[in-house]
Design a protein with these regions (language model features):
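Phosphate- and divalent-cation-binding pockets in alpha/beta enzyme and binding domains
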Residues: 26, 83, 107-111, 176-177
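Short, acidic loop-to-helix structural element flanking the phosphoryl-transfer center
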Residues: 68, 72-106
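Short acidic-hydrophobic, aromatic-tinged amphipathic segments that line or gate anion-handling sites
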Residues: 122, 198-207
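Active-site neighborhood of HAD-like aspartate-dependent phosphohydrolases
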Residues: 1-52, 56-57
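Substrate-recognition "cap/lid" segment bordering the active-site pocket of phosphatases
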Residues: 111-165, 195
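Acidic, Mg2+-coordinating phosphoryl-transfer loop and its flanking beta/alpha structural elements
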Residues: 98-103, 162-202
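Short, basic/glycine-rich phosphate-binding loops at helix/coil junctions
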Residues: 54-71, 128-135
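Surface-exposed amphipathic alpha-helices with a cationic face
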Residues: 85-93, 147-148, 152-159, 179
Length: 211
């Protein structure tokens, strides 16, 4: 039963649907450029650079001539959270649409959406030239701290009001996104959720206790 008439369930990707925390960190780790990513993250969180500049610095720190194939190979080694397939099957059975809203990378979002039969996704993009080589400037669609903006844009496109949606994330970066839905859930191993409006869950399946 869908007591709240929920039409869409939107999920963060890294750390929520997937077990790992960041597709960007996975690529930095592969190329040995974690220190560059950490430095850019610090500047971003301190408000000294915006997210587009953060992306540009991340991408520029990777080796020149990197190909789409290599990036896709790094991102293909992902682990879907154990209960996630069950959750998406149940949402389909209830005729509730599904979406990913992630500040991660579109290559990964597209693959996970296909694996789990997720209806919609929005993510940040990498750009490649005609030979498949990485270009230094990405496509910024989802600011980590303002996922709600990308989410509202998606909802407007598909014609669903936010009051008929739920949102699920796992970090403080997701707060604006979670609060923009009818119900917001934070997947966390601690019971200390940083906002009283957000519902704490230990497993994704617990969203069904509330809808």
């Amino acid at each position: 039963m869908n007591q709240l008439e929920i039409k869409l369930a939107a999920f963060d990707l890294d750390g929520t649907v997937l077990e790992h925390n960041s597709s960007w960190v996975a690529i930095h780790r592969h190329f040995g450029t974690e220190h560059n990513g950490a430095a850019s993250l610090r500047l971003y969180t301190e408000g000294k650079i915006d997210y587009r500049e953060f992306m540009r610095r991340d991408i520029s720190s990777w080796p020149k001539g990197v190909t789409r194939e290599e990036i896709a190979g790094v991102l293909s080694d992902y682990r879907i959270r154990r209960e996630a397939p069950e959750v998406f099957r149940e949402l389909r059975a209830r005729r509730i649409g599904t979406a990913l809203v992630t500040s991660g990378i579109d290559i990964l979002a597209r693959d996970v959406a296909a694996d789990l039969e997720i209806d919609h996704w929005v993510a940040n993009g990498l750009r490649f030239d005609g030979n498949g080589k990485l270009l230094p400037k990405g496509v910024g669609r989802v600011d980590p701290t303002r996922k709600d903006i990308a989410y509202q844009r998606l909802l407007s496109k598909i014609g669903i009001p936010s009051k008929k949606t739920i949102a699920i994330g796992d970090t403080i970066y997701d707060l604006a996104f979670l609060k923009s839905a009818r119900l917001g859930f934070m997947l966390a191993h601690t019971t200390r959720v940083p906002d009283p409006e957000i519902i704490h869950i230990n497993k994704l399946t617990q969203i069904f206790d509330h809808i």
